[in-house]
Amino acid sequence: MKQKIFNYILLSWMVVLTGYTIIESRKAPPDVEFELKLNDREIMKDLEANVTNMLAVCEYYDVKHPRIVTAQAILESDNFESELFKEYNNPFGLYNSKKKDYFKFKHWTDAVAAYISMVEHRYAGGDYYRFLEELPYAQDSRYIDKVRIIESNLPP
């Protein structure tokens, strides 16, 4: 009898802990500084935002489709000239729904790390454009077409 009670209590605690773990894992992550390679800030802090540097940073961080992601940055930031980009260092228009404002980064290269954490980590393979279509990323119905055109005009 004691063994049954013990097993019941043990099982109950396991269920509670499992449930708690699942709930905690689904909560929004705390506000974090999006950096993948912490020592790189000194190296990258002087990089000007342009196509060449965006491609290089995307490749450095092993972005799976650096040309498409660079094209997204060009479109979203109006070729790195938008107010959002200038004030927030946010070339992708990444939005913080918790704060009801766009994410603000110390440097535009941090936004590349954030893109990986917030968008690309969901990518399971296959057609990246289809993946982007399925995300609630852009409100423009021609977004994917525009990104394709920009990508096709990027330097090799």
Stretch-by-stretch model annotation:
Residues 2-156:
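Catalytic cores of secreted/periplasmic lytic hydrolases that degrade extracellular macromolecules
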